[in-house]
Each structure stands twice: as structure tokens, then as C-alpha cells.
């Protein structure tokens, strides 16, 4: 069935949404304001899903600078939008999430971008020899990925991936543990294969510098989900002390190595589940930093942080929806002092959000 419709707004994942037979109809690769023809391939009781067939009236914000084949690949959800439209989509999404989920009005929001809008990823998982059409098992052969750093190349003949970075090296031991090393703000980080490290170094650096601005020399800081110690070690010079808590053993080993290698004395890493640590902890912390997974903070963790009563909570999130939901639980005791979004993943619908909460002065 072919439908004609006008795209009215965007879904959370950047799909265009119009209405056909009074049902919301989701179409990938279209822009708000465009009039299109689309083939409806899925019908439910409450919505349609459709595939773009023809653009009848095109938006001025459509991106024509990329080969059409790339639009079909999964992971490039916003590639058809120019940068102005991508920025507008992401800012609107953050503002709408906080309004709908937390009943909080963000009057003004900045979205920070790096210089690279393509070829910004220093790590990518690929299927050797080809990529796949979005939401399918059909393979497409492409000469390159538009998001991968141009220094990351494939040797097809020998089926090996080779990392070529002047400031990065690969290390190994007899136990075949493999690490990469990277440098940020003068601090060297060892990163194991099972440890997390941000894939867009330029934007990550902007975020960490911003976090550092909220740390004072007289503060004891608790860094939850501290990973390999990236935030803990980068803010150490600004704090009285930093305690990092992480349950992943490989990450803790990397964090302790990084602390010793960089000769940083005022940081302590603890290998423990965050909930268990907070339940046993008797130490007061002025500032708590959280950088949870996409699911956000569990309710038990929020309650334990509230009992700790830190003056500041610095919340870095890769999922604005769960960040807004968590703020809903904090807002009776804390107010938003600062919020800013970061375009960690251009050409995709993902957003990194930094929020700083300040304790309310109740009398």
C-alpha cells in the first residue's frame, strides 16, 4: 500500500512521523516538513511503518553530500539530515524528554560538537568483508565507513584489522591480554579489550574538561561506575580526594595501573558493586559523579545517594530519557545548576547529556 503524507515530527530514533488514516506513520530517512510517498510494510492497531518511495516536496535541510548507498546502512540514522537539522533534532529531543518525563522546562540548551562530524570513531565493530542493510541480513560492500577514524584500515587480503595511530600502541603479555594506550590532558590511560573508553576522544575531552570546572580543591569526590578511572584521574588535580567504584575487574585493574603509571596519589579505586558500596559506606562526599549505563540509575542507588546528601551530583548520561526519569526522583532535594548536551555520535540519534545538580537549601 502506497501512502502520501507530510512529516510532522520525529520519533526518539530520528524517524519521520506523519499521519495516514489517522495513525502515526514512521518513515526512516525523511525530514520534518517534507511531503512524501511511502510504502506501508507494517500495520498495527495503533501505527504504521513505511519505507520512503518518493519525495514530493523536499526539505532544504536534506544532506546531499554523501553517496546514497550509505543511507541504507544501520548506524547512520541521521545521515540524510544536514548538520543544522541534526542539532535541532537533538536539542528538541532533550528538551522534550525533560518536559514530558520530569515536568522540567529547559529554557535554553547548548549542544556541543567536535570538529569531526564524520570519521570520529576510534573503535568500531564490523562484520568482515561487508556491512548490513539496516534491520536486515542483506550485505552491502562499502569501501569505507563514514564514522570510523580514517587511520583505522582493513587489510582484506590477510583479514586483519590494523590500528595506525601515532599516539597509540598495542601491548600484550604471555597470557595474551591485549591493551591499547591513549593520552588525554597529559594523563596516559591503559585500556583493556573488556574495558570501556569513549570512542569520540575530542568530544569526550570537552565533557571531562567541563566536569573538572565543577570540582573544588577542598572536595572529597565519589565517582560511581568509574571504569578505567578516566574521570577520576582527570579531575584528581582539582579535588582533595577521589574515590572510584567499579564492579568490572578488568576495568579496576586498568584504573589502578593508570593511577600508578601517572603517579596520582589522591585517588583510590574500589572493586565493588555500586549498591553494595553505598550500603556499607560511612564516608561523606561533597560531590558524587555518576556515569551509568543506558538504563540509568536504579531506584535503590538514587535513594542511597539521597541519604548521602552530597552538595553536588554530576550526572553524565548516554540516555536522556533515563536521565530525565532519574532527575524526577532527585528534584525534591536538588535543582539543576547546569545542563548541556554533547554530540558524541554525529549522524546517529544518540546524545550525551551532562547535568549538574545542586542541593536545595531548605529551611
UniProtKB/Swiss-Prot annotation:
The active site is at residue 318. GO terms for biological process: rRNA base methylation. Disulfide bonds: none annotated. Keywords: Methyltransferase, S-adenosyl-L-methionine, Transferase. It holds the Pfam family tRNA_U5-meth_tr. One of its GO terms (molecular function) is rRNA (uridine-C5-)-methyltransferase activity. Signal peptide: none annotated. S-adenosyl-L-methionine binds at residues 198, 225, 246, 291. Its EC number is 2.1.1.-. Belongs to the class I-like SAM-binding methyltransferase superfamily. RNA M5U methyltransferase family. This is Uncharacterized RNA methyltransferase MMOB5020.
